[in-house]
């Protein structure tokens, strides 16, 4: 049974993986298929195709993305007010929400990423279990630490959950892969196909998904794909 929705349609009615792609979007513009909530997100050309970029060079603490009210309505409809209040109160880590994925519960989320720059941080991550109050989980890689880490965000407070079993230095300005697999409360995190992170969550996953960054990171994202549990 497929366990998440796309554009209001249960994925049980659709076959195969679902990609959230900006390849056909206009370079230099804000993305449509990912809704920026915090930070500066753009569609840029890279390697002959358009990809998603977070540009942290102008990052400022407490600065949500422009047009937040309209974007919150796209994400949560009539429930958007609480989301806006919490984003404004705790805008610190850049993230963008995948358009149309109503409720991811079980399966895999994968993407390619490329860390390009960053003086304070060099991060890219997969965001999931995003709630209307702004709480979420993220699995991220940080090139400043060479590790994969699971973090939880609750009422704007970031809390460390678990670090990967080993450090994995990754070359900058090259593509790498990240995957998060959820089965019930079991979570697995992979870098370049290698299992580095295993954790049992306190409760099942349910919520929206997206991409994540930190402070002044400049990173590219591509091939964002969801595979529902069968």
Q: Where are the language model's segments positioned?
A:
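Short tryptophan-centered beta-strand motifs in secreted/extracellular beta-sheet-rich domains
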Residues: 22, 109-111, 173-189
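Extracellular glycan-recognition surfaces and repeat-rich motifs
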Residues: 26-78
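Beta-strand-rich interaction surfaces with strong enrichment in secreted/lumenal proteins
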Residues: 94-102, 164-170, 199
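Short, solvent-exposed beta-strand-to-loop segments that form ligand-recognition rims
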Residues: 190-210
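Short, aromatic/His-centered strand-loop micro-motif at the edge of beta-sheets
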Residues: 155-179
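Secretory/extracellular carbohydrate-interaction modules
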Residues: 58-154
